[in-house]
Amino acid sequence: MKNKGIFYAFTIITLWALSLTYLLHYKINFYDPLVYVFMLVQTHLYTGIFITAHDSIHGVAVPNNKRVNKWIGFFCATIFAYNNYEKLSRKHHLHHSNVVTEKDPDYYDGNFFRWYLKFALEYITIWQIILMAITYNLLKLIFPMENLIVFWEIPAILSTLQLFYFGTYIPHRGEHELADKYKARSQKNNHFVAFITCYYFGYHHEHHAYPYLPWWQLAVAKEKEDALN
């Protein structure tokens, strides 16, 4: 397929939007196990929204059309809690060029909770909080409050934890081999686990070594790296 990037981006955005629309009308019963399954599915799709924005930052969501690539990235960053695409891009490139140093905006030499707090404060702004609050109060006029919390707000929070844990904390924590200039480790080669945890982003050494690869090609890169080693 020539335009895989557009296909994957469109698929993730469409599935997220359709499932959210359905779930905002879903009758919630907290004894219903499907409520929790749907919440996790929505979390995974929301994470996919950010991963698509991330690929756009690297210019690989739609590599043959810079304008469309940037538009998709801007759109995905915006619906991911009103993130500023230009700010994300600037900080993410700083992360790649200064990985695990004081200049790395994603790095913190501390425990999980303090690192996550620093990570969140690095990117979240007061304007995002205000816009999310306005959006919530407007949507509350149309949809049940508990549906908004369970299928929109909680997945938004969980997806940041998912991205942080599998895409920052696990790959970059602790000591790294001196020979590893990327200072990024990868999870074990298990494509199913890697996909459901964070769209292969757990193959983080491969991402830093080949930042021009979109998320769906990291599995192949992992296999090649393992074969070489």
Feature names for model-found ranges:
Residues 19-34:
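Short, hydrophobic transmembrane alpha-helix segments
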Residues 63-113, 173-229:
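Membrane-proximal soluble regions of multi-pass membrane proteins
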Residues 1-11:
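N-terminal membrane topogenic signal
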Residues 38-53, 73-82:
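A generic, lipid-embedded transmembrane alpha helix
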Residues 36-43, 101-195:
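Hydrophobic transmembrane alpha-helical segments that form the core helix bundle
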Residues 4, 30-34, 63-71, 144-146, ...:
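Membrane-helix interface segments
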Residues 49-50, 85, 163, 167:
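Alpha-helical transmembrane segments of polytopic integral membrane proteins
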Residues 51-62, 95-96:
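Active-site recognition of the HExxH zinc-binding catalytic motif
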